[in-house]
């Protein structure tokens, strides 16, 4: 940069860059004591003293006298705009000092704001990636099994919290992915800003750093942290997810509705049955059976227990033709008690009159113990089963169920002491006439019948009759 030229003066200012060096040369350069920058052209206001720069060996061998001055532009830059200063020497070399243009400086306060913003974006990106793993790693069947069978109340509550989010699974998924993409793009832009501000690299360098940060914070850390405590973290961050859904709803909600139309909505209704195929119990059973342990039997019981939810009363009932039933007019005689005892009957269904469709109640064999003598022998009496039902009113506690009713709907009645459930089936009739029964008794269901569906055959009074 030649500031001293005999008989010449250029009115345009020199535009200074960070690494520019001012060179002075000429016959009288050796008389220059120092150089400085002034805010006015008269060189009366010294704002920055220049430091003489040591010459390279090549420049020392040049003919003539040469002096170099180096300017630290960063010390003179201002974020308010371009600054103009005048180069001056002592003593002056020309009547009019030469103007230098200092480019606009960078606002460091913005950097102090951008750094916390970068940390926030990294944290949010990791959170969104982790939530995607935590919430979507549990299937609807997994959550329902935890709600219904887990003994830990806290785990049940956490499963309920996550199930609340899964009712809008597409909306939640789009929200999480949108938030993750937004944070990742922001991280890349911020890294590019820092690279330009500090001047530490080009496009490839910025991409490498951004890729490394995203790999660590959005892939590795979420996989290590969120997968170990997925249900607990997803439950605790449910309100954060809901808040994010509200903020991003103008974009994420229409996309979620579009996914519902194209792919369908996930069935997260609490009343929906478990999808047994999704549980893959058969695969687990086959894998563990090769180990020769008891896992096969345990998984078989689990599978039968779950399938019991799908069965109807007609699937587990004992058909009425195989049930020992007695008329209300049957006298309680010695032979009757002996016959009932030998056949292994513990519960005696009593019907009204001559029709087996009108069940009056169910007597327990223990009720007959009142008529036994001290030696266990029955005595002939004039009592009938109908009379005993009238006396023992509590033994009339039984329930009627339709043959199409699911087993789980009347299991609680059997557990609470109901001796048996009478299964009825409605007849197909054109019109209902007076005194015409529109239903028929087709079987009975006891608690033992339900247990047999789970554990297999149990030796009970039905098997005693077959023996």
Curated annotation (Swiss-Prot):
InterPro entries in UniProt: ACDP, CBS_dom_sf, CNNM, Ion_transp-like_CBS
Molecular function as annotated in GO: transmembrane transporter activity
Compartment annotation: Cell membrane
One GO biological process term: determination of adult lifespan
Glycosylated residue positions: 61, 364
Extracellular topological segments: 1-110, 192-196, 260-467
Membrane association type: Multi-pass membrane protein
Alphabetically ordered keywords of this record: CBS domain, Cell membrane, Glycoprotein, Ion transport, Membrane, Repeat, Transmembrane, Transmembrane helix, Transport
Residues annotated as domain CBS: 317-381, 394-461
Parts of the chain on the Cytoplasmic side: 132-170, 218-238
GO cellular component: plasma membrane
Disruption phenotype: No visible phenotype. Quintuple knockout with cnnm-1, cnnm-2, cnnm-3 and cnnm-5 results in a reduced lifespan and 100% sterility.
UniProt keyword Cytoplasm present: no
Every CNNM transmembrane domain range: 107-293
CDD domains: CBS_pair_CorC_HlyC_assoc
Transport as UniProt keyword: yes
Transmembrane segments annotated in the record for this chain: 111-131, 171-191, 197-217, 239-259
Cited Pfam families: CNNM (PF01595)
Role: Probable metal transporter. Probably acts redundantly with the other metal transport proteins cnnm-1, cnnm-2, cnnm-3 and cnnm-5 to regulate Mg(2+) homeostasis.
Stated family: Belongs to the ACDP family.
Protein name (Swiss-Prot/TrEMBL): Metal transporter cnnm-4
Species the sequence originates in: Caenorhabditis elegans
